[in-house]
Amino acid sequence: MYYGFDIGGTKIALGVFDSTRRLQWEKRVPTPHTSYSAFLDAVCELVEEADQRFGVKGSVGIGIPGMPETEDGTLYAANVPAASGKPLRADLSARLDRDVRLDNDANCFALSEAWDDEFTQYPLVMGLILGTGVGGGLVLNGKPITGQSYITGEFGHMRLPVDALTLMGFDFPLRRCGCGQMGCIENYLSGRGFAWLYQHYYDQSLQAPEIIALWEQGDEQAHAHVERYLDLLAVCLGNILTIVDPDLLVIGGGLSNFTAITTQLAERLPRHLLPVARAPRIERARHGDAGGMRGAAFLHLTD
């Protein structure tokens, strides 16, 4: 059995998957915020409960919103302070007496989608998350690509390309990102960025779902906003896809529920790619909230 943990700032979610990659059981508990020992206990107790339930010693994979910094799994995870700066993988491996795999939650999302029955035919899969932030991951032949600093797929921290400024105007404000850099595309393409763009152009403070509801009602202002956002997304993706050249692009996160993104993006991309380039197949993520658990569990299928 394959145990996949999706760990976030509020919850620790465990999914147990069988050899056919089907979910057999899941359970969620609150994430301890201040005590590392309590955090380890919470994870280990879930593993022990799963072992007893299924009568096996399952493999353990963990997806967490952070970046492993060393081989022992020490990670930077601002949203999970109890585990940040701790040798999480090494400590869990010792306590559970088994190999524990650890990766960024966005990489786990991409891996989950790459291992979908319909998508395994594609050698190079790019996962793109358009949610609270912008992130993603790359999977080549069923294995996540991490890079020496574990930052592969941090697409949100690429800066706005020149074509974006041509589209938006050269007086378009370059916003400071939480990472400290200026003009990161996350500030414009995330759910929060989607709302910020609307306020910037129309001086109205609405959240993304409210703007999308107006678009669905045929509101002209919302329509113009969505057109501008999709053009900006296509411009930024043109740079990324020229570098990565994936066979499949899977889009997840809250904005992926807005069908116009997947249905209208494909027609905009070719003008931002090399003439000889083929745009990838574009699909909405298949596995929703279970994607993080799936991808973490499948870290043990990548050998």
Curated annotation (Swiss-Prot):
A Pfam family recorded for this sequence: ROK
Reactions mediated catalytically: N-acetyl-D-glucosamine + ATP = N-acetyl-D-glucosamine 6-phosphate + ADP + H(+)
Domain of life per record: Bacteria
Keywords assigned: ATP-binding, Carbohydrate metabolism, Kinase, Metal-binding, Nucleotide-binding, Transferase, Zinc
Residues the record lists as binding Zn(2+): H157, C177, C179, C184
UniProt xrefs under Gene3D superfamilies: 3.30.420.40
GO biological process, one term: N-acetylglucosamine metabolic process
CDD domains: ASKHA_NBD_ROK_NAGK
PROSITE patterns xref list: ROK
Binding-site list for ATP: 4-11, 133-140
EC number(s) from the headed UniProt entry: 2.7.1.59
Family annotation (SUPFAM superfamilies): Actin-like ATPase domain
Molecular-function GO terms, alphabetical: ATP binding; N-acetylglucosamine kinase activity; zinc ion binding
Cross-referenced InterPro entries: ATPase_NBD (IPR043129), N-acetyl-D-glucosamine_kinase (IPR023505), ROK (IPR000600), ROK_cs (IPR049874)
Induction info: Expressed in mid-log phase, part of the nagK-cobB operon.
Metabolic or biological pathway: Cell wall biogenesis; peptidoglycan recycling
Record-linked PANTHER family: N-ACETYL-D-GLUCOSAMINE KINASE (PTHR18964:SF162), ROK (REPRESSOR, ORF, KINASE) FAMILY (PTHR18964)
Biological role stated in the UniProt entry: Catalyzes the phosphorylation of N-acetyl-D-glucosamine (GlcNAc) derived from cell-wall degradation, yielding GlcNAc-6-P.
NCBIfam families: PRK13310.1
Family statement drawn from the similarity comment of this UniProt entry: Belongs to the ROK (NagC/XylR) family. NagK subfamily.
HAMAP family (UniProt xref): GlcNAc_kinase (MF_01271)
Name under which the protein is recorded: N-acetyl-D-glucosamine kinase
Organism: Salmonella typhimurium (strain LT2 / SGSC1412 / ATCC 700720)
Lineage summary: Bacteria, Pseudomonadati, Pseudomonadota, Gammaproteobacteria, Enterobacterales
